[in-house]
Amino acid sequence: TETMEKEFFRDFEKLYSRVFVVYDRPKDQEHPERNMTSRIMRRYYKNDMDLEERKLQLTLYPEGGNLVAGVENCVAFEAVWNDGEWLEGYLHFGGDSVPAVHRGRGVFTVTPEKGMEREVLFRTRDGQDISASLPKAEEGVALQVRRTEDAWRIRIQTSGPLSPDSLLLTVMREGVLKEYKRIDSTYQEFTLAEDTLEAGVHQATVFDTQGRVYADRLFFVRKKEVETASLQVEGVREEYAPYERMELSVSGQKSSTPISVSIRDGYMHETLYDNASIMAEMLLSSEIHGFVPDPGWYFEEDDENRRQGLDLLMMTQGWRRFKWRDMAVKGEWELTETAEKAQV
């Protein structure tokens, strides 16, 4: 509901669990306050000390991580209140207007000159303005990832004295290498057939032989066979009398497998923003930074709006699991704890 949207919105500065949400950061890490709420019983409100004047925030996210001089860059943006509620409106830059298409997010293109410093303006539907400065454009590597009809196109452009033949591109999923390409020109495109990739978050990274990362981008691959429910239940009515016998028809795959069944009163069901299915939780929510509100929305349909919203989510909340230099260069890291010899 709209009321819950304002009271229980995600905040990147808070801590989250898959089981329940921790709304206020504990003061003491060793003995955290038990300042939690059973949401069925009552609402939760922030501590008075956390209340502050609402302010508009505009954040810019250059695709790949950096704004690169002399080449075309895509920049995602997110316009929200400081408590996380998103805004509707348009971003204005260089005479162009770009709408916020999903949860205050959108994307625009720019070809900056080296050292260029400019501001962009976001105007809300009710006429409020908020501005933000573009990062200073430097020489480096611009990375763009786009989905075509049945493949993913990765475009790499270098700017400045970088030697292209020292750069490499990897595509990984859950830490497993899926593609490995050597970059041998200042402008290069690679096409990855979608049927060679698995469902879930993939990480495209451009780095050199020393392990220095120049660009990094997350993108999400959808698979209909994964998203389609393997079981269908028929025969559920809107209402039942107390202790009334129920007969349901379950159909699905022919393979024999154990199935768990859970029955609850739909009247007591509370609509939450954390409405992810097991698939959405494993493939999406657990793979990116921060709480993802209403993750089930991205998988309700396979249309352009949801694909665009999913890609904007990757460009704004996407993050790297580890530092590539630490993992790639010998001597950059050492074990601080011995390996466990049994289950924890």
Per-region residue spans from a language model:
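Short beta-strand segments within Ig-like beta-sandwich modules, predominantly Fibronectin type-III
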Residues: 97-104, 180-186
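Short, small/polar-rich motifs associated with maturation and membrane association
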Residues: 196, 201-203, 208, 213, ...
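Exposed aromatic-hydrophobic patches
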Residues: 105-113, 153-155, 188-195, 216, ...
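Low-complexity, Pro/Ser/Thr- and charge-rich linker/hinge segments at domain boundaries
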Residues: 11-12, 19-53, 58-60, 68, ...
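Short acidic/polar inter-strand loop motif in beta-rich domains
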Residues: 2-11, 124-131, 176, 206-216, ...
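Beta-strand-rich binding/interaction modules
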Residues: 1, 72-96, 117-124, 151-181, ...
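Acidic glycine/proline-rich low-complexity segments
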Residues: 2-50, 133, 218, 254-335
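Edge strands and adjacent loops of beta-rich recognition modules
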Residues: 45-70, 132-147, 162-164, 315-341
